[in-house]
C-alpha cells in the first residue's frame, strides 16, 4: 500500500499487534520521537488491513540510546 507498513506486526488467531519503533539519543528526543511514532501510526492507519482481527493493538515505542538508559523508555498505545 502507499501508506507503507509498521516496523513490526505480530498476528495471532484473533489479534494483530502493530509496533512502530523509533530511536533517540536522549530522553528529550525520545519524547519527540514518541509523538512522531503515534502520529505515523494514525496517519498511515497501520494494522487496519484485511483480514480484520477481533482485536487490533497498536503501540508506538522509542529506544533511548543514552548510555545511562539504553532501553525502550517511551511507549504509547494508539
For each predicted feature, which ranges?
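Structural signature of nuclease core domains in nucleic-acid processing machines
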Residues: 1-78
Amino acid at each position: 500500500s502507499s501508506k507503507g507498513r509498521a516496523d513490526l506486526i505480530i498476528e495471532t488467531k484473533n489479534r494483530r499487534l502493530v509496533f512502530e519503533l523509533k530511536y533517540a539519543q536522549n530522553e528529550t528526543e525520545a519524547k519527540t520521537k514518541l509523538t512522531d511514532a503515534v502520529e505515523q501510526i494514525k496517519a498511515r492507519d497501520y494494522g487496519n488491513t484485511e483480514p480484520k482481527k477481533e482485536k487490533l493493538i497498536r503501540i508506538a515505542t522509542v529506544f533511548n540510546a543514552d548510555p545511562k538508559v539504553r532501553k525502550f523508555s517511551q511507549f504509547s498505545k494508539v
